[in-house]
């Protein structure tokens, strides 16, 4: 088995990638700003990064921030990986980074190009939005009495555990270049997703679609962020877990945790 470094290994995706790789018998190092012994800020680089990649066969690069710094972080990581003789760099990107003119997407696309031109063996996987991100957007919109959502926009949310499994498999294999995109099992309109969220959460809100302006909105409305098939595009992969299944499992987990907490408090009181 190989030694694999996972950047952003304590995050939503990186944590699951780490668990999957360890379950498959790989030696895994977790790099994040606060995880010892490889606590490294990739935007700064430095000797800590060199120690983290020393003796590593493969790097799975999950660390990312919409607040900026991804390109600088990737340059530092690639430089250290080349110096250490890393064999394979796996990068997780987003479906639509070349179709939707959003600042964060432009940064992800720039990192893709850095990876491709790194001189390392490389693999790039693009995935659609995680269920968790769509949920956060809907929860934010539901803070108002009326849920205001961009008109005419659909989404294709995917289960993060399925993305993690795909990344782990790619990390264990030979460099493959740009691989087929991974999207969720269903393309759904935002109002449809919102109504599913309201139904499972037991909340009541009026859902209203609002036309917006700008290139990013036009890109999302045109479906540039969805997995494309046919018309000369490579066939994309699809996850299996639907948004309703994600919401239901999350609600059931919260219910079990609540019951366990109440039982614990009752036991202590008795």
Walk through the language-model features, giving the residues of each.
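N-terminal Rossmann NAD(P)H-binding glycine-rich loop of SDR-like oxidoreductase domains
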Residues: 2-26
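A hydrophobic C-terminal alpha-helical subdomain
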Residues: 198-256, 265-270
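Glycine/proline-rich active-site loop of Rossmann-fold NAD(P)-dependent oxidoreductases
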Residues: 132-138, 170-180, 203-205
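NAD(P)H-binding glycine-rich loop region in Rossmannoid oxidoreductase-like domains
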Residues: 26-84, 94-100
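Glycine-/Pro-rich loop/turn segments that contact NAD(P) or position catalytic residues
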Residues: 65-143, 155
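Non-catalytic, hydrophobic alpha-helical segments
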Residues: 160-167, 182, 190-193, 246
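Rossmann-fold NAD(P)-dependent oxidoreductase module
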Residues: 16-20, 80, 114, 166, ...
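Glycine-rich "substrate-gating" loop/helix at the edge of Rossmann-like oxidoreductase active sites
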Residues: 128, 149-160, 183-186
């Amino acid at each position: 088995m190989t030694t694999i470094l996972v950047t952003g290994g304590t995050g939503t995706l990186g944590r699951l990638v780490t668990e999957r790789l360890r379950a498959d018998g790989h030696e895994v190092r977790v790099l994040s700003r606060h995880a010892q012994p490889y606590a490294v800020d990739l935007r700064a680089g430095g000797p800590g990064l060199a120690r983290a990649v020393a003796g590593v066969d493969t790097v799975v690069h999950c660390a990312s921030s919409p607040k900026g710094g991804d390109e600088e972080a990737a340059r530092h990581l690639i430089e250290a990986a080349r110096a250490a003789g890393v064999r394979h760099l796996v990068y997780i990107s987003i479906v639509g980074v070349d179709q939707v003119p959003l600042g964060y997407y432009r940064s992800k696309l720039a990192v893709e190009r850095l990876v491709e031109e790194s001189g390392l063996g490389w693999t790039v996987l693009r995935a659609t939005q995680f269920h968790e991100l769509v949920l956060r957007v809907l929860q934010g919109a539901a803070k108002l009495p009326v849920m205001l959502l961009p008109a005419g926009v659909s989404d294709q949310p995917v289960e993060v555990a399925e993305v993690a499994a795909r990344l782990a498999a790619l990390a264990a294999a030979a460099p493959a270049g740009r691989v087929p995109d991974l999207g969720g099992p269903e393309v759904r309109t935002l109002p449809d997703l919102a109504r599913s969220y309201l139904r499972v959460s037991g909340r009541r809100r009026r859902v209203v679609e609002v036309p917006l302006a700008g290139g990013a909105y036009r890109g999302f409305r045109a479906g540039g962020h969805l997995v494309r098939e046919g018309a000369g595009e490579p066939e994309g992969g699809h996850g299996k877990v639907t948004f309703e299944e994600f919401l239901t499992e999350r609600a059931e987990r919260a219910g079990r945790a609540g019951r366990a907490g109440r039982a614990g408090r009752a036991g202590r009181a008795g």
